[in-house]
């Protein structure tokens, strides 16, 4: 057992702080061991929980016990029985002798032996898993354990059946005997206790032998002789055991006769002699272990043993019990086996005490193992050496066995005293052994349960059989619980909760054993081997002390059990196991109940732990299932999203193809002759629109309607232009040429000019100068590409001839896009001419390249990319107008051109040139943008005319553009997303168109935004979103729009209704420029029109004009970047964003004086992006330039607008969140959208003073489509 003990000890130590996982692993190991043991001892199950083993059980146990004997022998060798015997001897002396005598006696006198043996075995088993006692004996004796058990259980029949009886009798009635044995007083005290007593005290011989241990020499049964009286005592003990004795005899015969007697005799003799010498009780005990058949010879020692055993068992029970409880619970299978062995022991013990048997049963697994090892060891080493070493080993083993015997111990009340002594004897070894039990206890629930039963057995030896049975049936028995409950009260001392079980058991057992050793001293003795020796002496001298020990032992074991239970519980709960602990426990007669309670607690806890484990396992399984299901759902969602996107793209491609076809069909309505006035152009455009289709017709009608308004718009445009740029105003004057020049300067100047330019353009008036008609046409043009002012590469939009829009790609190469509406075309044509010259492919996106010739002029504009863009656009517009008859429309086209190259921003502007025109514009922009983003071109194209939309299709974006109308030029070049944008932001730009001026301004702001729009729209939707260009950068478009817008605005409104594009058109712009703002007001109406729908508007022609104008404006606007509200400090949240104007910003009640020196937060630039992996939209925003004069931003407020065909009111903008300000750029992801819907998003900043900055230009996106992917 030494070897065993040490490894186990190591294990235990490892376990001290074991986590649940470690414990589980240990449990698994133990289970395997148990299973092996089970295979070795099939009886385990039989005698498992109830001490009563089937007669067969003992036999099996006996086999096991035999093995155990060897182990015990080895263990004995490992431990110097004498060394430990002395310690153990206090209890063990008697115990050992008793055990051996008992065992021998048990063999001889099964009844006593069983009882005594039971206790002894229990103690032995605990010490040397009585298994040795009965096991070997049992094995040999056929029932030493069995014999005892068998005898008690089988042979004893009494013990077994009588377990209570035999145990009672023998054990003092396992139950009663246990109590008696354990108590030495309970009814079976006579038999059990008496036996025990007899053994111990009653059996003076036993006692004498036990104390004398010389008797052990008298190996009557091996130990009988060894135990002094072993035979006589066995006899007397057995006799004392009475029935047990007679019962035991059978068992004894088996045990003693077989192994018990012979082996016990020999082992006991050897061990007994050794034990005798050493306190045979230990050696005997060990022998008992060793012989396990010898245990049969433990009748006499049984009494003492019973007492010591009881105590020992109690201690063991407590410690081992606690340990064993875990161990047993863990190793319940093991326990079963052990029980078999122990049951054999228990058989002996059981004979002695049913409880013992039960304990044995519970304990047996461990005991069995230990016994096996012990027996093997003992056998291997030789009985004498074995006995002495065994004593120590047995001490260890006893500890293990004791822990194994915990159950035994429990049922060992009788044995308790003996056990106590044995335990004390085995304390040293038990410490190590106990560690193992503790480990086992810690790890296995089985052991724990078993331990519980053992513990309950300990408390009530008499009751134990029943308890054991109860425990077998249900781990917690009321009596056990009672005992556990009372234990703490009695003398429950727990040094460390965590360590209680293991440590407590280890040291506690030792201490308890020591204490038990001196029953009287038990309380006073802690970790006192000397006390143990004294106890031994006392036991030897006094059976009473043994009994006392038994009691104290019991008490201790009970309190220990309680400690163990609690500590175990704690340990289990905390997942930390500390094994080192010493506890003094003093218990009185009610220990049994207390122990029972403790055991019940332990069992309940174990059950709870098991249930928790099962629950955790089930929970983990459920979690995995749920995860799998969720994963599947996610995959499905992704699939549906992808499918929806594919479907959308398919539709767009189809639309684009149709657009291309249409374009080819009416490539360009003959462009208005250059000479034609804008009005002419407008007429042409109108015609074109009609030709183009209903959308165009609508646009046209809108245009016509707008035409009257245009003048006023123009005025605003002019105003805007003046505000934006002086030159633009000039342009506004409607001198396209003028505008052109203005554009250049103004472009550079900033978006302002663009507005005027736009005005000019819008005013088609430019050429017509006053011509409202042209203006109107421009409006239809809502195309107002938002050419980003940046369009400086106006070249982009060059139209080579009226029919064609020329898009200068960034490179500046010209791309001709045929404009559908001839009028538009003609306008464009003129423009194109200019554009070509313009072609500063400067358009490189940044430069507001006014698509139109103006743009070429724009080169200057290029210089000032954003600002310029507008100007340039304006210029192009002017140029276009001038060149092309002032038709301007064409100019617009260039404007559209404008931004793509310039800035995506401008494009973003989205020229909301007339709702549809947007679409055209978008298309145009697209065309333009191609270079930039296609958007610009489309925008231009759009502006050029509805055809523009067609051209957009050409661009590729074009496809979307017509229907989409909102091509999203806003994308401006970079953001081919413009088309998307249209959805989300583009509309805003379109709005801009409506209020051309405002738009312009916004446009510039938009510029930043365009990226937003552009991202989604340009590609697929450019045509669609045409205007959506949202050329953020190129506010140009807006600017252009602005002029146009004014004209357009009104028109846009009308056409807006026709084309929703209007909606978005205006909005963006207004934010961009103050003048625009005014325009915006007008635009609002337009805005209200759903700019988005406008996309559909074929109006491109009109759009075209508008676009040009818009572009022009855009040039100025670029600074504004329509998309970004910031530019328009005046928060115009309510601007007709897409479907509805943004909500007004509440004014803080009071501003601190510091706020006066700071300006409102800047207008952010918003970009949208689709998240492909999940159905989400990423909003990212930043500012174009950091304004140091602004107050610190506290948070950003996000608003969302779900587009609905019904009324559009600011209240439809819902605040979806507030994000604490972090260093820009910032981004957040939104999810959970209604698929197939269009959403608009806007962001505004709130500074630390509670003031709200302007909204960014709203950005739109289709939830299902990937338009918005930027």
Curated annotation (Swiss-Prot):
Gene3D superfamilies: Immunoglobulins. There is a cross-link at residues 33, 558, 910, 938 (Glycyl lysine isopeptide (Lys-Gly) (interchain with G-Cter in SUMO2)). Pfam families: ATF7IP_BD (PF16788), fn3_4 (PF16794). A motif (Nuclear localization signal) lies at residues 553-571. GO terms for cellular component: cytosol; nuclear body; nucleoplasm; nucleus; transcription regulator complex. Residues 617-665 form a coiled coil. Residues 132-203, 248-269, 843-854 have a biased composition (Low complexity). Residues 562-817 are annotated as: Interaction with SETDB1. Residues 474-486, 822-834, 918-942, 950-964, 988-999, 1016-1026 have a biased composition (Polar residues). It is found in: Nucleus. The modification Phosphothreonine is found at residue 118. Residues 1134-1151 have a biased composition (Pro residues). The modification Phosphoserine is found at residues 57, 113, 445, 473-474, 477, 479, 496, 559, 673, 899. Residues 965-975 are annotated as: Interaction with SUMO. Residues 347-356, 496-509 have a biased composition (Acidic residues). Residues 104-223, 235-402, 455-570, 658-685, 822-862, 886-906, 918-1026, 1115-1160 are annotated as: Disordered. Keywords: Acetylation, Activator, Coiled coil, Host-virus interaction, Isopeptide bond, Nucleus, Phosphoprotein, Repressor, Transcription, Transcription regulation, Ubl conjugation. It comes from the Eukaryota. Detected at low levels in breast, lung and stomach; highly up-regulated in the corresponding cancerous tissues (at protein level). Interacts with MBD1; the interaction is enhanced when MBD1 is sumoylated. Interacts with SETDB1; the interaction protects SETDB1 from proteasomal degradation and is required to stimulate histone methyltransferase activity and facilitate the conversion of dimethylated to trimethylated H3 'Lys-9'. Interacts with SUMO ubiquitin-like proteins (SUMO1, SUNO2 and SUMO3), with a preference for SUMO2 and SUMO3. Interacts with SP1, ATF7 and ZHX1. Interacts with the general transcription machinery, including ERCC2, ERCC3, GTF2E1, GTF2E2 and POLR2A. Belongs to the MCAF family. This is Activating transcription factor 7-interacting protein 1. It comes from Homo sapiens (Human). The gene is ATF7IP.
């Amino acid at each position: 057992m030494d070897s065993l003990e040490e490894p186990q000890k190591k294990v235990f130590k490892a376990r001290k702080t074991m986590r649940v996982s470690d414990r589980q692993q240990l449990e698994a190991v133990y289970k395997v061991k148990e299973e092996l043991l089970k295979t070795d001892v099939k009886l385990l199950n039989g005698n498992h929980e109830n001490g009563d083993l089937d007669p067969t059980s003992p036999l099996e146990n006996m086999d096991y016990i035999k093995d155990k004997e060897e182990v015990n022998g080895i263990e004995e060798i490992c431990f110097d029985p004498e060394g430990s015997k002395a310690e153990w001897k206090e209890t063990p002396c008697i115990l050992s002798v008793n055990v051996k005598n008992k065992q021998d006696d048990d063999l001889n006198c099964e009844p006593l032996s069983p009882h005594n043996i039971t206790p002894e075995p229990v103690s032995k088993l605990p010490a040397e898993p009585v298994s040795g006692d009965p096991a070997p004996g049992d094995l040999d004796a056929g029932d030493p354990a069995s014999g005892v058990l068998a005898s008690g259980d089988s042979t004893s029949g009494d013990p077994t059946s009588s377990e209570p009886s035999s145990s009672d009798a023998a054990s003092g009635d396992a139950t009663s005997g246990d109590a008696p044995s354990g108590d030495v007083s309970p009814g079976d005290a006579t038999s059990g206790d008496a036996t025990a007593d007899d053994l111990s005290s009653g059996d003076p011989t036993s006692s004498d032998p036990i104390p004398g241990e010389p008797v052990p020499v008298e190996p009557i049964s091996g130990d009988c002789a060894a135990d002094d009286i072993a035979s006589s005592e066995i006899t007397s003990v057995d006799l004392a055991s009475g029935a047990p004795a007679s019962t035991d005899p059978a068992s004894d015969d088996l045990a003693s006769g077989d192994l018990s007697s012979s082996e016990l005799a020999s082992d006991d003799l050897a061990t007994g002699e050794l034990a005798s010498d050493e306190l045979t009780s230990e050696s005997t005990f060990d022998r008992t272990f060793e012989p396990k058949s010898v245990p049969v010879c433990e009748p006499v020692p049984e009494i003492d043993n019973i007492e010591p055993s009881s105590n020992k068992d109690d201690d063991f029970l407590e410690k081992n019990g606690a340990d064993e409880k875990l161990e047993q619970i863990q190793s319940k299978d093991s326990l079963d086996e052990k029980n078999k062995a122990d049951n054999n022991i228990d058989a002996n013990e059981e004979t002695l005490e049913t409880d013992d048997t039960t304990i044995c049963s519970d304990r047996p697994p461990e005991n069995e193992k230990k016994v096996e090892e012990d027996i093997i060891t003992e056998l291997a080493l030789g009985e004498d050496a074995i006995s002495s070493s065994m004593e120590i080993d047995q001490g260890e083993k006893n500890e293990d066995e004791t822990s194994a015997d915990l159950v035994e111990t429990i049922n060992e009340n009788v044995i308790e005293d003996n056990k106590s002594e044995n335990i004390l004897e085995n304390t040293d070894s038990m410490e190590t052994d106990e560690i193992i039990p503790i480990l086992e206890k810690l790890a296995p629930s089985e052991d724990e349960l078993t331990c519980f039963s053992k513990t309950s057995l300990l408390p009530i030896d008499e009751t134990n059989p029943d308890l054991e049975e109860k425990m077998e049936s249900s781990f917690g028995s009321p009596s056990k619980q009672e005992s556990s409950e009372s234990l703490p009260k009695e003398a429950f001392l727990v040094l460390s909760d965590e360590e209680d079980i293991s440590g407590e058991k280890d040291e506690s057992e030792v201490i308890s054993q020591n204490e038990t050793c001196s029953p009287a001293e038990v309380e006073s003795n802690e970790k006192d081997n000397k006390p143990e020796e004294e106890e031994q002496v006392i036991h030897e001298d006094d059976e009473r002390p043994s009994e006392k020990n038994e009691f104290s032992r019991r008490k201790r074991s009970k309190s220990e059990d309680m400690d163990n239970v609690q500590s175990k519980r704690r340990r289990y709960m905390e997942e930390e196991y500390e094994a080192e602990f010493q506890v003094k426990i003093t218990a009185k007669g009610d220990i049994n109940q207390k122990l029972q309670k403790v055991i019940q607690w332990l069992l309940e806890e174990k059950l709870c732990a098991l249930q928790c484990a099962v629950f955790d396992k089930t929970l983990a399984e459920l979690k995995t299932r749920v995860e799998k299901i969720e994963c599947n759902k996610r995959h499905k969602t992704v699939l549906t999203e992808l499918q929806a996107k594919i479907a959308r793209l398919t539709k767009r491609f189809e639309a684009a193809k149709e657009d291309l076809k249409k374009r080819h069909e009416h490539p360009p309505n003959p462009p208005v002759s250059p000479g034609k006035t804008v009005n002419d152009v407008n007429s042409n455009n109108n015609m074109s629109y009609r030709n183009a289709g209903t959308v165009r017709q609508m646009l046209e009608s809108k245009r016509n309607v707008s035409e009257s308004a245009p003048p006023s718009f123009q005025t605003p445009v002019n105003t805007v232009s003046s505000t934006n740029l002086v030159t633009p105003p000039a342009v506004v004057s409607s001198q396209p040429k003028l505008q052109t020049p203005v554009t250049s300067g103004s472009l550079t100047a900033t978006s302002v000019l663009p507005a005027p330019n736009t005005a000019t353009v819008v005013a088609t008036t430019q050429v017509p100068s006053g011509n409202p008609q042209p203006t109107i046409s421009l409006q239809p043009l809502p195309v107002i590409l938002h050419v980003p002012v940046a369009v400086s590469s106006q070249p982009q939009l060059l139209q080579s001839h009226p029919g064609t829009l020329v898009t200068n790609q960034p490179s500046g190469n010209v791309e001709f896009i045929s404009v559908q509406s001839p009028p538009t075309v003609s306008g464009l044509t003129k423009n194109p001419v200019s554009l070509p010259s313009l072609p500063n492919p400067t358009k490189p996106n940044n430069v507001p390249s006014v698509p139109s010739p103006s743009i070429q002029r724009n080169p200057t504009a290029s210089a000032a990319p954003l600002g310029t863009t507008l100007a340039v656009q304006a210029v192009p517009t002017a140029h276009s107008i001038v060149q092309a008859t002032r038709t301007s429309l064409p100019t617009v086209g260039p404007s559209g051109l404008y931004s793509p190259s310039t800035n995506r921003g401008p494009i973003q502007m989205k020229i909301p040139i007339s709702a549809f025109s947007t679409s055209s514009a978008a298309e145009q922009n697209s065309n333009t943008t191609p270079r930039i983003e296609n958007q610009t071109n489309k925008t231009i194209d759009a502006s050029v005319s509805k055809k523009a939309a067609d051209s957009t299709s050409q661009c590729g974006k074009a496809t979307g553009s017509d229907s989409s109308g909102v091509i999203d030029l806003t994308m401006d070049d970079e953001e081919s997303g413009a088309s998307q944008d249209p959805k989300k932001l583009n509309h805003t730009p379109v709005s801009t168109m409506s209020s051309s001026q405002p738009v312009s301004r916004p446009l510039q702001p938009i510029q930043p935004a365009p990226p937003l729009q552009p991202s989604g729209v340009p590609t697929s939707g450019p045509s669609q979103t045409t205007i959506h260009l949202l050329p953020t950068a190129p506010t140009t478009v807006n600017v252009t729009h602005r002029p146009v817008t004014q004209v357009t605005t009104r028109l846009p409104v009308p056409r807006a209704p026709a084309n929703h594009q209007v909606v978005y058109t205006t909005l963006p712009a207004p934010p961009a420029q103050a003048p625009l703002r005014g325009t915006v007001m007008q635009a609002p109406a337009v805005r209200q029109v759903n700019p988005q729908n406008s996309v559909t508007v074929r109006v491109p022609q009109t759009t075209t004009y508008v676009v040009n104008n818009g572009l022009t404006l855009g040039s100025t606007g670029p600074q504004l970047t329509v998309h970004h509200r910031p530019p328009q400090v005046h928060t115009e949240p309510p601007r007709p964003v897409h479907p509805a104007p943004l909500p007004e910003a509440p004014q803080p009640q009071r501003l601190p004086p510091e706020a006066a020196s700071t300006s409102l937060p800047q207008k952010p630039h918003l970009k949208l992006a689709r998240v492909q992996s999940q159905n989400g939209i990423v909003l990212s925003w930043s500012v174009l330039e950091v304004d140091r004069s602004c107050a610190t931003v506290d948070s950003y407020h996000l608003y969302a607008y779900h587009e609905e065909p019904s009324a559009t009111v600011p209240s439809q903008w819902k605040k979806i969140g507030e994000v604490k300000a972090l260093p820009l750029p910032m981004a957040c992801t939104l999810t959970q959208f209604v698929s197939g819907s269009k959403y608009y998003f806007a962001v505004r900043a709130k500074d630390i003073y509670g003031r709200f900055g302007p909204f960014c230009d709203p950005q739109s996106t289709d939830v299902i489509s990937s338009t918005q992917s930027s």
